[in-house]
């Protein structure tokens, strides 16, 4: 409608087995909107300006292997910006672990709140810039449960680091005790002190 060419690859269907009822439904939807379905991810690989990953969601807990691992690897090799929907396929939403292989996004559009695995290594490397989009889930929906973690952002800094008096010195605002390192392992202590 806006002059943008869109292609769909049905990642859940292995080549030669495109006979399932879900595949037929997806094919009808694409046909009704005149959206071509491609046979491999590599079809038109140099023409993609945007690659959208929506293969797996936050509930993934098993390792990705076989054909789907190949698809994700092929997607990572495509040109253009890469965007994941909710979480990069192959990333554990709870701990950021890579489950076999993972899509490497430039941006992730996630819903309601960021997922812990998007901020922990190695998941953060695969998530790119995380954009949290509200979808109508209110604080009341959590029935009094508060998140276990929070992400500090630049907008939080003024509250955490109040303006300092120009006549202050290193002893005015308290002192810091660093307990780190061990014999022949002083790297963490040195980094914290700097």
Residue ranges and their predicted role:
Residues 28, 73, 100, 190-194:
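Alpha-helical segments flanking ligand/cofactor-binding loops in enzyme cores
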Residues 48-50, 55-147:
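Internal gly/pro-rich beta-alpha loop/helix module
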Residues 1-13, 18-20, 24, 48, ...:
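Small-residue (G/A/S/T)-rich helix-start motifs and N-terminal tracts that mark the onset
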Residues 32-38, 65, 89-93, 156-162:
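Short gly/ser/thr-rich secondary-structure transition/capping motifs
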Residues 1-54, 63-85:
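Nucleotide and nucleotide-moiety/phosphate-recognizing core
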């Amino acid at each position: 409608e806006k002059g943008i060419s869109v292609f769909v690859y049905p990642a859940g269907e292995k080549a030669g087995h495109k006979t399932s009822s879900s595949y037929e439904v997806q094919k009808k939807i694409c046909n009704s909107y005149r959206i071509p379905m491609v046979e491999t991810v590599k079809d038109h690989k140099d023409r993609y300006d945007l690659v959208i990953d929506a293969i797996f969601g936050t509930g993934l807990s098993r390792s990705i292997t076989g054909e789907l691992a190949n698809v994700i690897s092929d997607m990572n090799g495509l040109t253009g910006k890469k965007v994941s929907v909710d979480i990069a396929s192959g990333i554990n939403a709870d701990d950021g672990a890579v489950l076999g292989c993972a899509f490497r996004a430039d941006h992730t559009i996630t819903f309601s709140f960021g997922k812990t695995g998007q901020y922990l290594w190695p998941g953060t490397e695969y998530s790119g810039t995380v954009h949290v989009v509200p979808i109508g889930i209110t604080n009341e929906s959590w029935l009094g449960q508060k998140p276990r973690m929070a992400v500090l952002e630049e907008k939080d800094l003024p509250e955490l680091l109040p303006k300092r008096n120009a006549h202050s010195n290193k002893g005015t605002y308290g002192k810091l005790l660093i307990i780190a390192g061990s014999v022949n392992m002083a790297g963490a202590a040195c980094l914290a002190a700097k």
